[in-house]
Amino acid sequence: EKVKEHYLSTLQPAKAKTILGCIELLESRYYEVARPPELQKQLDREWIADMKDYPEDLIHQACVNWRNSSQSFAPRSAGVLMESVKPEYVRRKSLYLKAKSVLELI
């Protein structure tokens, strides 16, 4: 059971506040467009919805990877931003599912 909990802990989703904090900090490094408050709220909701399954450490790592890339603009979508950490996320999910299925056999 501890093994399953360990792998599950590596998939613990980030909180909405963490997601927005990371995105706001990353976007602040680039040219920012003034947006009406309602539009900004909708964009924030979309970022949260699109990234709600990702663990906090992978969101931070994706932001670091973006900052250290040759991109001269802020990411426009979660898919583009998270591309660099997607293999690690998939690896973690696979390990969790394997551990879970093995433990169910025991």
Regions found by a protein language model. Give the residues of each.
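Charged interaction scaffolds used for protein-protein
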Residues: 1-106
